[in-house]
Amino acid sequence: MPPRQRPPRRTPRSVVYRRRLGALAVLVAAIAAVWFIVASVKGGNDTKTQPTVPVAAPKPFRIVFPEGFTRAQMAQRVAAVAKIAQKERGRKPKLKASTYLAATKRPRFIPGFGKHPLEGFLFPATYDFTGRTTSAQLTKRQLQAFQRNWSQLNVAYARSKNLTPYDVLIIASMVEEETAAPEERQLVSAVIYNRLRDHMQLGIDATLRYGLHIPPTESIHQSQLQTPNPYNTSALGGHFGLPPTPIGNPGLASLQAAAHPAKVNFLYFVRKPDKKHHFFTDSLDAFNAYKAAHGYP
């Protein structure tokens, strides 16, 4: 009788598990090798992964409109800055003088003021722009800046003197042009209020310069003082009252001075030799004596 055969020994489960893990590792390694080869072919010889670097947005340009600048002067500043922007970036920006003049040419309805030319409402400040910024967008930002600053004013005193908000804006533009020392703004404003009260011609040289386009570097001649012009407020041939529009675009300090003049009775002022401060008086004799003493005509 042949000997009885034993059944084959079963492989332990732990061994089977290890073998399966090994086979899986081989499969993963094979897949990784194939992916590496394909990636190398697509990416060239450089097998290193290149990091993604975000592209920074171009730095905006900056345009500065000084207080008192007229609409025309702002257009000149736009032209100058646009030229710099073109030189640095190699392309013309949308912002340019001709489109700025066109965007600011027509009168608009301004809340609280009515429909007026934009001279006076183009708030002087520093504005950033890019190559895509349009003149219409810049103008809109200036008008918004004006409204924000104007909202800080209380024009109750001006209204008590029968002056409108637009009148206050006109006065502010004259204050801006006539003063170099900040502490004199309210004094110049007071002279304007007092002369309006006494039905006197304002005698503001800056209004005539604006109306006749006389540069500040040129002297005003006697014949020009007698020129019939709505912006001529001189005592020799000018009209009474305020000029028809602002003569520039005032900043917040001049707006505040126009709404809150100093409580003084001054009617005259003349620039001192330092070309920054003024001599103020309520006496015509004292005014003329000061001018004579310093060789003023």
What are the residue ranges of the model-derived segments?
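Hydrophobic membrane-insertion alpha-helices, especially the h-region
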Residues: 24-36
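Bacterial extracytoplasmic/cell-wall-associated proteins, especially those involved in peptidoglycan
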Residues: 84, 101-297
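N-terminal Lys/Arg-rich, disordered targeting/topogenic segments
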Residues: 1-18
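Signal peptide-directed extracytoplasmic domains
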Residues: 19-20, 38-153
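Membrane interfacial helix-start segments of signal peptides and signal-anchor transmembrane helices
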Residues: 17-25
